[in-house]
Design a protein with these regions (language model features):
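Amphipathic alpha-helical repeat scaffolds of TPR domains
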Residues: 120-137, 168
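Conserved redox-active cysteine motifs that mediate thiol-disulfide chemistry
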Residues: 205-206, 213-230
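Short coil/turn connectors between adjacent alpha-helices in alpha-solenoid helical repeat scaffolds
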Residues: 101, 138-146
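Structural microenvironment flanking redox-active thiols in thiol-disulfide oxidoreductases
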Residues: 222-261, 271-278, 309
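N-proximal helix/coil linker or "cap" segments that precede and/or mark the start of modular domains
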Residues: 145-192, 197, 202-207, 233, ...
Length: 316
């Protein structure tokens, strides 16, 4: 059979017969012949002829399997799954601990290969795709300086790479990161407090505010609570406060967690379907930031003793 695709951009597409059953193919002008090379439970690896970009992608996948030592990793996975099927938690923990160095080494080897491959393909769409899919999302864009440096770096990609959708996707994300970077005015947050009254972040303008994004079900979030209490005590009477922000769906669990953890500061429960993760560029919780009296973000991703040490740099 034949597919005719009107695609003006050279880009990676998913080719399959139904969602989750298929694999990736680089779309480019010409007559591409596609047949399955390997079919696994996790999807299909397509063999594509008549395409320079797909040859580059195929060669990268083969090299990646070698440097990562995928055969060894597959055998370790099999051992872990066998122990899991037996519900042998002790054996699962042992395998996980002893396997970790191999996975870390594999990730380091893959990262090195990715960077080398990107450097060798700065002029073509494959290079920008690989950069976007493997490296871009793992970079730190918490400051305006980092965002500016990233925009400058992307200018190094050639004209053909600049015409791909990946540049537009990254620019859109950088614009979003700029809105929640250190030095930017913290976006407004609105919701209800523990008594059901309206509350918003700007109510605390004029104070230093630790904003703690958390949920009652998040174990790691609640482990930060003792450190937050220390911060509240350390800066008592110094124009400082804490605002907990949660998107808990069950108000009773949210209230119970606040009471149980002795989180004796202001709390805000977000309205349903509030996309706070996008607004604040949050990749996971806990996500704790410091906002200054002027409403600007002073610090991000604070943990443990940083909840006292970082504000101390600003509060005198």
């Amino acid at each position: 059979f034949t597919f005719t695709v009107d695609c003006a951009k050279k880009q990676m597409l998913f080719l399959g017969f139904r969602p989750g059953q298929g694999g990736m193919v680089f779309a480019e002008a010409g007559n591409l012949k596609v047949k399955p090379a390997t079919v696994k439970k996790g999807g299909v690896v397509w063999e594509v002829s008549g395409s320079v970009l797909n040859n580059k992608y195929r060669d990268f996948l083969k090299a990646c399997a070698v440097v990562r030592n995928d055969r060894l990793l597959d055998s370790l996975d099999a051992l872990f799954f066998t122990a899991r099927d037996r519900e042998d938690r002790e054996e699962m923990a042992r395998i996980k601990e002893e396997s970790m160095p191999y996975y870390e080494q594999a990730q380091m080897a893959e990262d090195q290969l990715v960077r080398q491959t990107v450097d060798g393909n700065m002029e073509n769409p494959f290079g920008i795709y690989l950069y976007y899919s493997k490296l871009f999302g793992r970079k730190d864009f918490s400051t305006k300086e980092n965002i500016g440096a990233e925009r400058e770096y992307q200018k190094n990609f050639g004209p053909e790479a600049q015409q791909t959708p990946y540049i537009a996707l990254m620019n859109a994300q950088l614009d979003r990161y700029a809105g929640c970077a250190i030095g930017a005015v913290a976006p407004e947050i609105t919701g209800r407090d523990t008594l059901g009254n309206p509350i918003k972040l700007s109510d605390f303008r004029g104070k230093y505010v630790i904003v703690d994004f958390w949920d009652s079900y998040c174990h790691w979030c609640r482990e930060e609570t003792p450190w937050l209490r220390k911060a509240l005590e350390a800066f008592k009477g110094k124009n400082f406060t804490i605002l907990g922000v949660s998107d808990d769906r069950k108000k009773e669990l949210w209230l119970a967690a606040i009471k149980e953890d002795h989180s004796n500061w202001d709390h805000l429960l977000l309205p349903p379907k509030t996309d706070i993760f996008t607004t604040y560029c949050i990749k996971g919780i806990p996500h704790i930031i410091l906002v200054g009296p002027d409403g600007k973000i002073l610090a991000k991703e604070m943990r443990h003793e940083e909840l006292t040490d970082v504000p101390a740099n600003f509060i005198k």
